[in-house]
C-alpha cells in the first residue's frame, strides 16, 4: 500500500509539474504575444518619426523652394503654387491716426466685431472686442444669409456701445483668398477651412457686406478690405516700423510682407502712391516637394472636402494637427491592443482638438495625468497604462515639431525673398544702419503660436538652425493680440485720413 501511495504521489507530482509548465508556457506565450503587439505600436510611432523628420538641411531646401514659388507668383498669375496676391495696401499706419473706427474680422467659424479709439503717437486709447460664433448652416448656406448675420451683429454691437456711425471708418478683415480690385473691394477666389458657399465665389465680398449693412439700416461702408495677415502687419507696423512681414499660425496659416513694386513683375506699370506694396503670400497651398506625406496626411486629405488643396496648411495649422494625431492613434490601435479593446472613440473625425494635442505634449506630471484624462474624456479610452501614455505624448511631440519647423522654414523664405536672412537673395544693405544690422520684426498672431509654448520653442529653435545664431538674433517675432481685427481698424482710419487730406 505504501508503495502504491508513493506511486500516486509521484504521478500527481508529475501532473502538477506538467500543469505548471503548461501554465508557465502559456504565460510566456501571452507575454511574448503582448510584446509583439507592443512592438507593433512602437513601430508605428518610429515610422511616423522617420517620415516627419525635418533636419536643418531639409528645411533649407523647403526655404529655397518656397522662395522660388514666391518669385514665380510675382511674375505671373497662375504661375506658382502660392498666389502672391496684391493687396492694394501701399501705406501702413504710422501712429498719427486718431479717432474712432470699426472693424469686422471674419476668418473661421466665428468672427469678431471691434471698436477702436486711437490717439496720436501710436496710442490705442480704447478697444472693445466682441466674439460671435457662426452657426454651421451659415457656412454652407447663401452669401446673403452670412453677410446679413454679420451686419446684424455689427448693428447690435454699435447700439450697445453707443456713439455715431455716420462717416465712421470700417475695416473688413476677410481671411480667404481674394483678388483685390481696390483697397475697398475684392472678389472671392475660393473658400478655405469650413466654408463652402459656392455662389459667393467670384463676388465682391466688400460689396456683399455693404449691401447687408444697408439692409440693416447702417449708414457706413467698408473702406478697407484686407485679410488677417495684412491686419496683423498693420498693427505691427503701427508700433514698430521695422516690421516687414506678418504671419498667422492659428486655425489656419498664411503670411504677408512688404514688397518693392519693381519686384512685382505681373503688375509693372500699375499706378501707386508708394514704392512698396503689401503682398499676401497665400502659402497654405504650397506643397514642398522635399516633404514626404505620411500615410496619415494622405488619409486625412482623402477625407477632407478640399482634398489635396492647402497641403502646407494641413501640416501646420491648428484645425488639422489634432486630427492627424487621432489617425496615428487609430493605426496604433489597429496594430495592437495598447488602448484596450473598446476603441470606438478613435473612429470619430476631429474628436481630438489641437488644444488637446498641446495639453498632451505639455503634460509634465510624473504619471502623465492630463494625458490619461484627455484620452478618457475625448477618445473614450479609460485606464490607459503609463507606458502607453508616454507613447501618446511622443506622437504629439512628433506632429508638433514637424509643424513648427515647417512654419519656421516658411518665415525664413520671406526673409530670404526680401534680403533679411543674410544671403544674397536681396540687398542686405537695406537692413543696415551705420554699419549695424537693423532688427527685422515679424508680427505674428494665432492661437497655435500664442498658446502652445512647445510649438514656439521648436519654431524658434528651427529659425536659429536655418539662419545661424548671428542673423537669428536680429529677427524678432512679436505677438500681436487681436492683430487682424485691430489692424483692419487702423488701416481704415489711415486710409480715411488720407482721403480727407486729399480732398482738402
UniProtKB/Swiss-Prot annotation:
Matching entries from SUPFAM superfamilies are given as: Actin-like ATPase domain (SSF53067)
Instruction: Name the segments for region: Hexokinase large subdomain.
Output: 227-482
Describe its membrane topology.
Single-pass membrane protein
Q: Where does ADP bind?
A: 108-109, 447
UniProt keyword terms in alphabetical order: ATP-binding, Chloroplast, Glycolysis, Kinase, Membrane, Nucleotide-binding, Plastid, Plastid outer membrane, Transferase, Transmembrane, Transmembrane helix
What does it do? Answer: Fructose and glucose phosphorylating enzyme.
Spell out the residue ranges making up region: Hexokinase small subdomain.
94-226
Protein's cellular compartments: Plastid, Chloroplast outer membrane
Where is the Hexokinase domain positioned along the sequence? 39-493
One further remark on this entry is: Expression may pollen-specific.
GO biological process terms on file: glycolytic process; hexose metabolic process; intracellular glucose homeostasis
Which residues take part in binding D-glucose?
192-193, 227, 254, 282, 313
What's a single GO MF annotation on this record?
glucokinase activity
Expression tissues: Expressed specifically in stamen.
EC? 2.7.1.1
Q: In which pathway does it act?
A: Carbohydrate metabolism; hexose metabolism; Carbohydrate degradation; glycolysis; D-glyceraldehyde 3-phosphate and glycerone phosphate from D-glucose: step 1/4
Reaction catalyzed: a D-hexose + ATP = a D-hexose 6-phosphate + ADP + H(+); D-fructose + ATP = D-fructose 6-phosphate + ADP + H(+); D-glucose + ATP = D-glucose 6-phosphate + ADP + H(+)
Do you know which InterPro entries this protein is assigned to?
A: ATPase_NBD (IPR043129), Hexokinase (IPR001312), Hexokinase_BS (IPR019807), Hexokinase_C (IPR022673), Hexokinase_N (IPR022672)
**Membrane-spanning segments:** 7-29
Q: What is its main location?
A: plastid
UniProt enzyme class: transferase
Family statement: Belongs to the hexokinase family.
Record's Gene Ontology CC terms?
chloroplast outer membrane; cytosol; mitochondrion
Q: Could you identify this protein by its name?
A: Hexokinase-10
Organism, as annotated: Oryza sativa subsp. japonica
Amino acid at each position: 500500500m505504501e508503495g502504491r501511495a508513493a506511486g500516486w504521489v509521484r504521478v500527481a507530482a508529475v501532473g502538477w509539474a506538467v500543469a505548471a509548465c503548461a501554465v508557465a508556457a502559456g504565460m510566456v506565450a501571452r507575454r511574448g504575444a503582448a510584446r509583439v503587439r507592443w512592438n507593433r505600436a512602437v513601430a508605428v510611432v518610429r515610422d511616423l518619426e522617420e517620415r516627419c523628420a525635418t533636419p536643418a538641411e531639409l528645411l533649407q531646401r523647403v526655404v529655397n523652394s518656397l522662395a522660388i514659388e514666391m518669385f514665380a507668383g510675382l511674375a505671373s498669375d497662375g504661375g506658382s503654387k502660392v498666389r502672391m496676391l496684391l493687396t492694394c495696401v501701399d501705406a501702413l499706419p504710422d501712429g498719427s491716426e486718431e479717432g474712432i473706427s470699426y472693424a469686422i474680422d471674419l476668418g473661421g467659424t466665428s468672427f469678431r466685431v471691434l471698436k477702436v479709439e486711437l490717439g496720436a503717437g501710436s496710442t490705442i486709447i480704447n478697444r472693445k472686442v466682441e466674439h460671435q460664433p457662426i452657426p454651421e448652416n451659415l457656412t454652407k448656406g447663401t452669401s446673403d444669409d452670412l453677410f446679413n448675420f454679420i451686419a446684424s451683429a455689427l448693428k447690435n454691437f454699435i447700439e450697445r456701445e453707443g456713439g455715431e456711425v455716420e462717416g465712421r471708418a470700417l475695416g473688413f478683415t476677410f481671411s480667404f483668398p481674394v483678388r483685390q480690385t481696390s483697397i475697398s473691394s475684392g472678389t472671392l477666389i475660393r473658400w478655405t477651412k469650413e466654408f463652402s458657399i459656392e455662389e459667393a465665389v467670384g463676388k465682391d465680398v466688400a460689396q456683399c457686406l455693404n449691401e447687408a449693412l444697408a439692409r440693416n439700416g447702417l449708414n457706413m461702408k467698408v473702406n478697407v478690405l484686407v485679410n488677417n495677415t495684412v491686419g496683423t502687419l498693420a498693427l505691427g507696423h503701427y508700433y514698430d516700423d521695422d516690421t516687414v512681414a506678418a504671419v498667422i499660425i492659428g486655425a489656419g496659416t498664411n503670411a504677408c510682407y512688404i514688397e518693392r513694386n519693381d519686384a512685382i513683375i505681373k503688375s509693372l506699370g500699375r499706378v501707386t502712391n508708394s514704392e512698396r506694396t503689401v503682398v499676401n503670400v497665400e502659402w497654405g497651398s504650397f506643397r514642398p516637394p522635399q516633404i514626404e506625406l505620411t500615410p496619415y496626411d494622405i488619409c486625412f486629405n482623402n477625407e477632407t472636402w478640399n482634398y489635396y488643396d492647402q497641403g502646407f496648411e494641413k501640416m501646420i495649422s491648428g484645425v488639422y494637427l489634432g486630427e492627424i494625431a487621432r489617425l496615428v492613434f487609430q493605426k496604433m490601435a489597429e496594430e495592437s491592443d495598447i488602448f484596450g479593446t473598446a476603441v470606438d472613440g478613435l473612429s470619430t473625425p476631429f474628436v481630438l482638438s489641437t488644444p488637446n494635442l498641446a495639453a498632451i505634449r505639455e503634460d509634465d506630471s510624473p504619471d502623465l495625468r492630463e494625458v490619461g484624462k484627455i484620452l478618457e474624456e475625448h477618445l473614450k479610452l479609460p485606464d490607459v497604462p503609463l507606458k502607453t501614455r508616454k507613447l501618446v505624448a511622443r506622437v504629439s511631440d512628433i506632429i508638433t515639431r514637424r509643424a513648427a519647423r515647417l512654419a519656421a522654414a516658411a518665415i525664413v523664405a520671406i526673409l530670404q525673398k526680401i534680403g533679411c536672412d543674410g544671403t544674397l537673395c536681396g540687398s542686405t544693405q537695406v537692413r543696415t544702419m551705420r554699419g549695424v544690422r537693423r532688427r527685422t520684426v515679424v508680427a505674428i498672431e494665432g492661437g497655435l503660436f500664442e498658446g502652445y509654448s512647445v510649438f514656439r520653442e521648436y519654431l524658434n529653435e528651427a529659425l536659429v538652425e536655418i539662419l545661424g545664431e548671428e542673423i537669428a538674433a536680429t529677427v524678432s517675432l512679436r505677438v500681436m493680440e487681436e492683430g487682424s481685427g485691430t489692424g483692419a481698424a487702423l488701416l481704415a482710419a489711415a486710409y480715411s485720413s488720407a482721403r480727407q487730406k486729399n480732398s482738402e
